[in-house]
Swiss-Prot record:
Source domain of life: Bacteria
Active site: residue positions: 78 (nucleophile)
InterPro entries reported in the protein's UniProt record: ACCD_DCysDesulf, ACP_carboxylate_deaminase, ACP_carboxylate_deaminase_bac, TrpB-like_PALP, TrpB-like_PALP_sf
SUPFAM superfamilies cross-referenced by the UniProt entry: Tryptophan synthase beta subunit-like PLP-dependent enzymes
Enzyme class, spelled out: hydrolase
Organism: Burkholderia mallei (strain ATCC 23344)
Protein name per UniProt: 1-aminocyclopropane-1-carboxylate deaminase
NCBIfam families: ACC_deam
KW Hydrolase (keyword) present: yes
Protein task: Catalyzes a cyclopropane ring-opening reaction, the irreversible conversion of 1-aminocyclopropane-1-carboxylate (ACC) to ammonia and alpha-ketobutyrate. Allows growth on ACC as a nitrogen source.
């Protein structure tokens, strides 16, 4: 496998720490050891997160093409668009963000706080569009790219989640390589890695990265899209493409993609009672915050899998914390009493 042949622009602090979740593990019976890899703490650029890790491989391509404007898309409380805005500000580039109405949630401040507030503060041209949720290519995004060109700019197209991009899976191939180096220092291997999945390239990159030592199917994706068939297809397609790009040496098959579909409902961006319980439990036991859209759902999935005995006793499970906490501000009514 050859990740080193790709240019990488440093936007993160370096390898992210792995933290034992001792109190949460004990609360759940102590038979499974839980750890978190803190990609939510990976950068000083507007809180960072998993998209910042991905953007390290997209930015050299944007600079090589002489682009002057980063154009991306997400929901109103998109972590993706906030991280793209931060990187654009850091590099002195312009930024156009299409923010669609992906979440069926209504709050007086939903489009004024959290991620979208930060994007505006960092100088991004934020464009609210009423279209609903989908993880495919969007006309509103294509229109924004065309508008930049019409105004004489040179846009660089960054799709939702950085996912459906030729380089979108590389960052999390690097995540797997990073974990392997940390495992050597820790003196043990993780039996499972739990990760949230929606647009697919985070899990796809991990699948490829961990396939290098035979652990592709130990990456347990937790769907948060509530459209798991679409998410699964995208993970597999991106993983196949990424495996070819990094010269993995074997094909990625559907057996390599494990996606738990039980925790994504009722809809994308709407937490269920299990999501909210997991958010509160992790906060109170560990001081680790997760959000209602993504990490709360993957945390719920991990907790429930421990409770149901789906991880064998003695397992060491690594939770990939991808970020997303700024969105908590947009759901403040749900947490008005803690």
């Amino acid at each position: 496998m050859n990740l080193q042949k790709f240019s990488r622009y440093p936007l993160t602090f370096g390898p992210t720490p792995i933290q034992p979740l001792k109190r949460l593990s004990a609360h759940l019976g102590g038979k499974v050891e839980l750890y978190a890899k803190r990609d939510d703490c990976n950068s000083g650029l507007a809180f960072g997160g998993n998209k910042t890790r991905k953007l390290e491989y997209l930015i050299p391509d944007a600079l090589a093409q002489g682009c002057d404007t980063l154009v991306s898309i997400g929901g109103i409380q998109s972590n993706q668009t906030r991280q793209v805005a931060a990187v654009a500000a850091h590099l002195g580039m312009k930024c156009v963000l299409v923010q669609e109405n992906w979440v069926n949630y209504h709050d007086a401040v939903y489009d004024r706080v959290g991620n979208i507030q930060m994007s505006r503060m960092m100088g991004a041209d934020v464009r609210l569009v009423p279209d609903g949720f989908d993880i495919g290519f969007r006309k509103s995004w294509e229109d924004a790219l065309a508008d930049v060109r019409a105004r004489g700019g040179k846009p660089y197209a960054i799709p939702a989640g950085c996912s459906d991009h030729p380089l979108g899976g590389l960052g999390f191939v690097g995540f797997a390589e990073e974990v392997r180096a940390q495992e050597a220092e820790l003196g043990f291997q993780f039996d499972y890695v739990v990760v949230c999945s929606v647009t697919g390239s985070t899990q796809a990159g991990m699948v490829v990265g961990f396939a290098a030592d035979g652990r592709a199917d130990r990456v347990i994706g937790v769907d948060a899209s509530a459209k798991p068939a679409q998410t699964r297809e995208q993970i597999l397609r991106i993983a196949k493409h990424t495996a070819d790009r990094v010269e993995l040496g074997r094909d990625i098959t559907s057996a390599d993609v494990v996606l738990d579909e039980r925790f994504g409902g009722p809809e994308y961006g709407l937490p269920n009672e299990g999501t909210l319980e997991a958010i509160r439990l992790c906060a109170k036991l560990e001081g680790v915050l997760t959000d209602p859209v993504y990490e709360g759902k993957s945390m719920h999935g991990m907790i429930e899998k421990v409770r149901l005995g789906e991880f064998p006793a003695g397992s060491k499970v690594l939770y990939a914390h991808l970020g997303g906490v700024p969105a908590l501000n947009a759901y403040s009514f749900l947490f008005r009493d803690g």
